[in-house]
Every structure is written in structure tokens, then in C-alpha cells.
């Protein structure tokens, strides 16, 4: 592969970044995959698969591994960032000096900035300046299923219509990967952050043993919280009925491939927060997102009772069953009020 003929450079060689790189390469594109740990990248190159996360999925020939960041970024103008939300800003600042003059940035990171609760678009603008085109992809995607070529659909949003069109064409594969465009840049970002929080609650409910009725109620009222917060931030409420909202919410609340759900289940079964995180062994985005989403809601005066109770459990030591009873004991109200 020549240094400047790749369709996409993927930053982040974890399970999801690898799965997206495989999907792009399988679609017939030349792809460069870079990760921060050279030893890990060298192991991927030697095995031609990600043995840690996706051991049964061989890399297509058109997927190139790269340990040198400057070389990886020189290979393509299109850069897909797939890193945890708490390091998102740091990674973009690391990329900035090496980006091509015509670079365009899209991310699959789901969450808000650690501590500040800012949307990732604001973090990206601060790190990269005002001229680089930005986009986000989000939706119901488990890395193992995506890498295996199982049917998957996501949403894509960008303020730059040309970039959005190019990305949709680049990512879309009629055989297995469907990409819906969405003009709501804020909503597509926010859905991926809030669903992480609600998934912890759904897992916690199941861990306690409350059953399907309670889980479904949490999903439904969690969607209401997501929609209220989105409306306050200027998002289109209909976005939350799509892939980046309801789609991702249902997936992560109901399937044990979700780290957030498994984390919540452990808490519901009586495990402490640190032990549950250690047991998962990977980043649980919803843990940090809970604090950040609640702070954002309070800033905008949005009521989010599920998120608030989860914050009490995660950061104040409240018992999970007691938190559930606090939600059930709230004042009676109209289901559709302030949606």
C-alpha cells in the first residue's frame, strides 16, 4: 500500500476500532489501523487478527497495521477515531500536528468529555480548530457481530453535507452494514452517551432479580430522559427514536455483550463498584457518563430521575434496591409530561 492511498485511517485498535477497520476493509477499501501500544499493533500484524477481542476474525489483505502515528495519518484524509471518551480530547491533540491539510475527522466514540460533560463536538473543535470537517457515527453495534459480518445498522451525522455523503458511501455495505444519514449532529452524539447510563440501570434491575417488566420500564423511561435532555440541548426529538437513540438503548439494555449492562448486573447482585469494574476488564463508559450526564441535565434544568438514582449508587454508595424503590415511590404524574 502506498503512503497516501488509503480510504480511511482508524485510530484505536480495541475491539470496536478493529471491527470497524475490518468492516471497511471487507467493503473493498484500503484501511490503516493505528493503536497507541506498538507491542499490541505488532501482535495484531503477526497474527493478522485481534486475538484479545476478535480471535476468530482474520484481517482482510487490505487492512494495514501501523505503529507510527505520522505515517498512519499521512495515509488518508479520512480519520476515524475510536477511543474511550475520557481520552478523546487528549488523542485529538496528539493527532493534530500530524494531520494532512485536507484531513476530515469522524468518531465512533460514545460519551461526553470527562469532568466537563461537554459534547465531543466541542472537544473536537477546541482541539482541532474550526476548519476541519467533523462527523460522528453511532448506533446499535457490538464489535463481535460487526466484525463477523452480521447485519448491522448505524446513524451518521455531520454539519458538512459533503463529508456526510462521502462517509455514507464509504461505510455502507449492502450485504451487512447499513448507514443512515441524520442531520442532527447533537442528537446522534447525545444518544450514545445517555444509553450507556440507562444500560447500567437495566443491568442493575436484572441483577436484583426484578424481571422483564422492570427492565422494560427502565428502557422506556430512560428514553424519555434521553429525549428531554436532547430537546434542551437543541437536538431533534425524533433522532432518539432512531439508531442512535432507541436502537442503541435497546441493544445495550438487553444483551449481555454490553459492558454497561454486565456492570449493572454485578452491582445489582451486591458487588461493589470497583470490583465490578475490575471484573469487566475494559472501560465501562457508563460509569463516567452517569456523572457527566447528570451534571449536564442539572445545568439545563432537565429532570432525569433514573440517572440521578444511578449516580447515587455509583458515587454515593446507595444500595441498588433502595434506589429502585426511590424511583417507584416518586410522585404520580402524566407519562407524557415534559417529553
Swiss-Prot record:
Q: Which Pfam families match?
A: NAD_Gly3P_dh_C (PF07479), NAD_Gly3P_dh_N (PF01210)
Indicate the enzyme's highest-level EC class. Answer: oxidoreductase
Gene Ontology annotations of biological process type = carbohydrate metabolic process; glycerol-3-phosphate biosynthetic process; glycerol-3-phosphate catabolic process; glycerophospholipid biosynthetic process
* Record field: catalytic activity: sn-glycerol 3-phosphate + NAD(+) = dihydroxyacetone phosphate + NADH + H(+); sn-glycerol 3-phosphate + NADP(+) = dihydroxyacetone phosphate + NADPH + H(+)
**Which amino acids does the record list as binding NADPH?**
15-16, 36, 110, 143, 259, 283, 285
**Active-site residues?**
195
Tell me where it resides: Cytoplasm
EC number(s) reported in the record: 1.1.1.94
Record's Gene3D superfamilies? N-(1-d-carboxylethyl)-l-norvaline Dehydrogenase, domain 2, NAD(P)-binding Rossmann-like Domain
Which pathway is it part of?
A: Membrane lipid metabolism; glycerophospholipid metabolism
Q: Which UniProt keywords apply?
A: Cytoplasm, Lipid biosynthesis, Lipid metabolism, NAD, NADP, Nucleotide-binding, Oxidoreductase, Phospholipid biosynthesis, Phospholipid metabolism
Show the GO MF annotations: glycerol-3-phosphate dehydrogenase [NAD(P)+] activity; NAD binding
Q: Which GO terms describe its cellular component?
A: cytosol
Positions with a binding annotation for sn-glycerol 3-phosphate: 110, 139, 141, 195, 248, 258-260
Relate the protein's function as given in its record: Catalyzes the reduction of the glycolytic intermediate dihydroxyacetone phosphate (DHAP) to sn-glycerol 3-phosphate (G3P), the key precursor for phospholipid synthesis.
Please give the family membership noted in the entry: Belongs to the NAD-dependent glycerol-3-phosphate dehydrogenase family.
Q: What is this protein called?
A: Glycerol-3-phosphate dehydrogenase [NAD(P)+]
Organism this protein belongs to: Pectobacterium atrosepticum (strain SCRI 1043 / ATCC BAA-672)
The lineage, from the top, is: Bacteria, Pseudomonadati, Pseudomonadota, Gammaproteobacteria, Enterobacterales
